[in-house]
């Protein structure tokens, strides 16, 4: 198993220079705060130059300081409670900068997802959706919103789509009782990963269904369970996980599925428009 950054620091500590040891010691004791610091700020609190901090990150094998910072934030996301996350973020973020900080984080998540997405995996995911006899979608906690959004549109485009709802633990498995070969389960989960989603994916896999995961990276437990797993960035600000990039990926799923059979898509929405008009589903703007 790949070591996390804290394990790497402990392992390499004896070989560090004096300045590197100072940085490493601070991070090991205060990783929750270091995860939100700029290179300049980390250099300031450790008494070394910003360039020393940047070189330190590169020596550890990261693509500059942003790469090391992301690795630290992964630790924070997986180890800290929501309250601890708030405290860590507030200790390094000026309240007046919240709006820009959140918007920048979302922009960065989208850009990182765009830079790292594997187009072949995405195409495989779309093929899995289109070839499935029955599609089950599961996402717990904040991922419920993503699962529901995906289901709304897939139900318009495809025939057999079910959202697995979190009511009680046993009822999750009851909703998956008929799943089997030829079916697909789409699992959506981000740190702190839902045990129920992971368990439901394993349940479906054991019954012969194919598994498609949407998560944040290779360290996610969904990665080992899924036949195809797509990664989107969801770097957090305080107790929040950003759902912007995951939602954008879901939008891409929906658009790709609809594009594979444009005739059916047009017919479906033409019929829906007539229904919406007849039953006054939407209001009209009077000029």
Residue map of PLM features:
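Short, Lys/Arg-enriched, disordered terminal segments
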Residues: 1-12, 284-287
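HTH-adjacent hinge/linker in prokaryotic transcriptional regulators
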Residues: 2-6, 15, 22, 32-36, ...
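Glycine-rich phosphate/diphosphate-binding loops that line cofactor/substrate pockets in enzymes
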Residues: 120-132
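Glycine-rich phosphate-binding loops that contact phosphosugars or nucleotide phosphates
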Residues: 130-248, 252-261
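A short, charged, Gly/Pro-tolerant segment at domain boundaries
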Residues: 263-287
């Amino acid at each position: 198993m790949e070591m996390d950054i804290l394990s790497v620091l402990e392992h390499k500590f004896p070989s560090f220079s004096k300045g590197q040891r100072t940085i490493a010691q601070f991070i090991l004791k205060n990783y929750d705060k270091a995860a939100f610091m700029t290179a300049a700020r980390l250099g300031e609190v450790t008494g070394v130059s910003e360039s020393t901090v940047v070189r330190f990150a590169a020596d550890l094998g990261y693509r500059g300081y942003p790469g090391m910072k992301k690795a630290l934030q992964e630790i924070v996301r997986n180890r800290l409670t929501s309250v601890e996350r708030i405290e860590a973020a507030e200790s390094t973020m000026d309240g007046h900068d919240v709006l820009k900080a959140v918007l920048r984080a979302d922009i960065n998540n989208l850009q990182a997802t765009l830079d790292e997405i594997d187009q072949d995996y995405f195409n495989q995911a779309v093929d899995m959706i289109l070839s499935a006899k029955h599609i089950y979608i599961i996402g717990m906690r904040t991922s419920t919103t993503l699962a529901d959004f995906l289901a709304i549109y897939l139900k318009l485009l495809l025939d057999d789509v079910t959202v697995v709802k979190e009511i009680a633990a046993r009822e999750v498995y009851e909703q998956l009782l008929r799943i089997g070969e030829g079916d697909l389960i789409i699992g959506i989960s981000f740190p702190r990963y839902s045990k129920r989603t992971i368990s439901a994916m394993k349940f479906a896999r054991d019954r012969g269904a194919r598994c498609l995961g949407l998560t944040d990276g290779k360290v996610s437990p969904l990665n080992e369970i899924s036949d195809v797993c797509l990664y989107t960035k969801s770097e957090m600000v305080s107790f929040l996980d950003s759902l912007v990039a995951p939602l954008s990926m879901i939008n891409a799923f929906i658009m790709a599925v609809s594009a594979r059979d444009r005739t059916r898509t047009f017919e479906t929405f033409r019929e829906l428009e007539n229904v919406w008009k007849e039953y006054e589903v939407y209001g009209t703007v009077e000029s």
